[in-house]
Curated annotation (Swiss-Prot):
Induction behaviour: Induced by treatment with gibberellin (GA3).
Keyword Repressor among record annotations: yes
Region (Disordered): 451-495
Location in or out of the cell: Nucleus
Protein name as catalogued: Protein SLENDER RICE1-LIKE 1
Function: Probable transcriptional regulator that acts as a repressor of the gibberellin (GA) signaling pathway. Its repressive activity is weaker than that of SLR1. Its overexpression prevents the GA signaling pathway and induces a dwarf phenotype.
Organism placement in taxonomy: Eukaryota, Viridiplantae, Streptophyta, Embryophyta, Tracheophyta
Start and end residues of each stretch annotated as Leucine repeat I (LRI): 84-140
Name of encoding gene: SLRL1
Amino acid sequence: MAMDTFPFQWPMDPAASSGLDAGFLPPPAAVAPDDGVGYYDPPAGADVDAAALPEFAAAFPPCAPDAAAAVLAMRREEEEVAGIRLVHLLMSCAGAIEAGDHALASAQLADSHAALAAVSAASGIGRVAVHFTTALSRRLFPSPVAPPTTDAEHAFLYHHFYEACPYLKFAHFTANQAILEAFHGCDHVHVIDFSLMQGLQWPALIQALALRPGGPPFLRITGIGPPSPTGRDELRDVGLRLADLARSVRVRFSFRGVAANSLDEVRPWMLQIAPGEAVAFNSVLQLHRLLGDPADQAPIDAVLDCVASVRPKIFTVIEQEADHNKTGFLDRFTEALFYYSAVFDSLDAASASGGAGNAMAEAYLQREICDIVCGEGAARRERHEPLSRWRDRLTRAGLSAVPLGSNALRQARMLVGLFSGEGHSVEEADGCLTLGWHGRPLFSASAWEAAGDGGGDNNNNSNSNVSGSSGSDSNNSGSSNGKSSGARDGSSVCL
């Protein structure tokens, strides 16, 4: 394998009457009686069953191809008109909500429910309209709070979304390629994952490092995730699976979990950065959840300060290319409606099988839609922002952009080409990559480093309180950061 080339390995998903009997109907009467009604009076001894079909009951000729195409085009046009009307009804409802007109919003919502019947559920706008109509209903008529989705349920839906479409695979591949290139020539490397989930991203990186000319480095992974409500150390479970893989490909490996309800609870000392190791931070669809209303102090600042203080070799950031952090409800609703319509269209095209897998992937997206539509203030977490705004924010935090090379662009296009659907495209913009659908960017990937020195090895890192990188101090009890549910150290796995 060529140096710094990431392998494609993803271990771990109407002639209706034509059938009538020709002797079934008698011929019509030749003479009409005075009452104006035609009667048939067969001659004596005539075999009624042997009579030929009357001319008017002959089989209809099949539709000409041009006529069938015209009918299909007319139906599509009718559905398109119905879809446009439904979109206008949903936007009118959102506008009435923003204006505080509950009665008008309720009437528009009722019309939206009725209009859904005229839109095909197989179309992107038809499926997404169901979710937005449901979300508007929940906002207008709040019901008793349902139990929140458990982490296990979220992980289940996340896995189906991963399998159904190219977006998360694109995110993992692009980030891993940048990390692999940043670690070139480094003997001790440390990846800090802001959202470990099931660890789906890391088997491919471990395999790529195993194939590195000159031998693999010593790899540490610190995985951050929420505390388990059952008390089971799920982070450690993921670490054990990764350790088994690393052992099988002869990569020296250490894993450590850090449990935190929010990323701003994590402090640099909890990461146990070791002197001399090259550090990479990785964030896939996480940073937008740290944003807040303009009047509030957002947790994003503390997290970016933490990243900058460590001075990493690379900081990979994948985010939705959307603007769902607007203060005006109608603007936010409109942007989300068209964004998710494109995502649903692409999801349908990417998955040839459809079925339950697609339904679970859509359920994953439905949670985001409900948060954007129903949530306000601190209750709203899905605050997606476009790449241009992330550039400004990350630059202010003391980070510099690292261009994603032509190699990453070429291989990302190859990866996306493995999925069905010709509408997907990967484009490069100012050193960043975007994955879009029919020309609309939907996800962006960028890479960053500490400004000034381009990042580097942590030879004199003042935030580290541990020398070495064995990660063998399992079950340490980390200090709370002043919150009642502060971050804590998790178990470690070492090879």
